[in-house]
Amino acid sequence: MSKINEKKLKKYIEDWSQSGKNEMEYPFCERVKEGWQIFLKGESLLRQKIDDMRNGVIKQNSDELVAACLELLNPVFQDICFETGYNGEKHELILTAEGDKAKLFPLIYFQKHAPKEVLERWNIIVGRRPFHEAYSIRMFGQNISMKDVWVWIEWKENKTAELFLYCEKLVSFLQENENYAYWLMCILLDQAVGEIPSIRYIDRFELLEQPKDGDGLPLTKLFNCMQKTLGLDTEEMLDGAKYCETYTAYELKPDENIKAGWRKDVFVGITSCVPLISEYLQNESRIMDSFYQDGITAGSFSYSVEGFTEENRGKQILDFRDQLEAEILEAAGEEAVTFIGGASGIYCCYLDFIAWNPIKVLEVAAEILKNKKIALAEFHPFWNDKKGIRLK
């Protein structure tokens, strides 16, 4: 890119900020590198505090332990949920996505870049593991355990499950405070099957005020039942990285008005991050705002399809997209970008991605696109209230 375009690009990215602070000056990829070095310097003290908790020197989940862990993680993540533990051999840092697949992507990136010096003493885990013993929650003077919950499963064609759950101890909560009852059950489900399987395979669940007809099973046996039905071993069930490479196809009704706006012409697409696409379509920005705080952005490269006129036009358009993805990935590197799918529209084709180093990715893409035989190409983030920038 020319010097003036570099300035224009940086000014464009600065305009994303609503607080006056440009988070992209310190991109996520750099935060991760520096963050792991900070973790290395402080991890011995964190291990000591975990051991103190195990030995009863400090209370379970004490403010002291939480503060020590946040001090090591906040240089990377402004908002992070985690658990710590010890499995008899190594200390464990468990990073949780709070039921949101979009949050898995930066957590997996962080996990993959853990230095070997950290991994000698720590297991860095993304997503809560199943609690195979009879986990229980004590609320309002009574214990509610997985053994108290019965479940009926209805499997769908896409290998996701709809659950119907009955717990006698929760019936009164269900009548008095339904949201609270569902919150408790979310916790129990995560402990029963693990966070990744819960996000990936449980489409929805319903709490019942009385048992359902037919044979049910205790919640303690749900994980094994899901494994058997899906034909997966434990590691496959809990593999968050593999889940982030799983794609979902979707169809939309396109707007034929060429002036309707970015992405309004899309009629079909595929994505590995459904929540991101859904939020954009619903004019929401929670995920994008959260990404921005950590020096991440997500968006699309779009290019005009008017120049593709051969008989195999559709294949040409998609082949061009695949080639563009490969060239950008080779030039920018996996450290800078993760591609998450794409979409086809009446007037444009779209290549979707998450950028861990946004400025580098856009500069690389502009350099590659300038030599392509297409009439128009631009970048647009998955914010409805932000403009795109022309790259060709």
Task: Cite the ranges covered by each PLM segment.
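Charge-rich, low-complexity segments
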Residues: 1-92, 98-102, 113-346, 356-366, ...
